[in-house]
Design a protein with these regions (language model features):
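Acidic (Asp/Glu) carboxylate-rich active-site/surface patches
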Residues: 1-186
Length: 186
C-alpha cells in the first residue's frame, strides 16, 4: 500500500504547493478510505469566544475527523496522530472536550491511539491525511472566494491585514467573522 504513495509524491504537505496537494489528493481520495471535518471560520470564532484556544480546537477537529471516519468504516487498527503538543497538554484538551458525549465515549474505549512528533515526515498515512485535509481547505477557500468575489489569503501577515480592511469596507464588519479567524494578532 505504501510504495505507490511515494510514487505519486506523498510527503509532508508543508513541503508541497497547493497545485501539487490538489493533484495528489485527487488520486488519494479515490484509493484510500478517509473522512474529514471542516470547521468554518465562523465555527472557529465561536469556539474562541467560548474560551477554547487554537490547540484545543485542533484537538476537536482531529477527534471529529476520527469519529467521522469511524462512522463510515469499521476499523480496529491503531490511530496515529501527528503530535502537535505535549501529551499532558493533549490530555488536558481531551478533558476540556469531555462534555461532548461522542468524544468522551470514544476516548474511554480507544486505547489504540498514538501521537507521533513530526508524524507527517515519518508515517505515510499521516502525510496522506494531511494532504487530503489541505485539499479540502483549498476547495473550501476557493468556494468562499467565488461566493464573495474576493480572493482571501491564508495566514496572518501585513497583506492579510490590508485585505481585512478592504473586505470590511466592501462587505461590512458584520460579515468578517464569517470569512476569517478573528483572533489572530497581526
Amino acid at each position: 500500500m505504501i510504495n505507490w504513495t511515494y510514487e505519486i509524491g506523498v510527503r509532508d504537505s508543508k513541503l508541497l504547493n497547493d497545485d501539487k496537494i490538489d493533484k495528489i489528493a485527487s488520486i488519494l481520495i479515490k484509493k484510500i478510505p478517509f473522512a474529514v471535518y471542516v470547521l468554518t471560520q465562523s465555527g472557529y470564532n465561536k469556539m474562541i469566544n467560548k474560551g477554547f484556544n487554537a490547540n484545543v480546537i485542533k484537538f476537536f477537529i482531529h477527534t471529529q475527523s476520527i469519529l467521522n471516519f469511524q462512522k463510515r468504516y469499521e476499523f480496529d487498527k491503531k490511530i496515529i496522530i501527528d503530535k502537535y503538543s505535549t501529551l499532558n497538554a493533549i490530555n488536558n484538551y481531551q478533558r476540556k472536550m469531555s462534555f461532548i458525549k461522542d468524544f468522551s465515549e470514544f476516548y474511554k474505549k480507544n486505547e489504540l491511539m498514538y501521537f507521533l512528533e513530526h508524524g507527517e515526515q515519518k508515517i505515510q498515512a499521516i502525510a496522506c491525511a494531511s494532504i487530503i485535509a489541505r485539499h479540502y481547505l483549498n476547495n473550501y477557500m476557493k468556494n468562499q472566494n467565488d461566493k464573495w468575489g474576493f480572493n482571501f489569503l491564508l495566514g496572518a501577515n501585513q497583506k492579510v491585514k490590508s485585505q481585512i480592511n478592504e473586505f470590511t469596507k466592501k462587505f461590512g464588519k458584520q460579515n468578517l467573522e464569517k470569512v476569517i479567524k478573528t483572533n489572530f494578532k497581526i
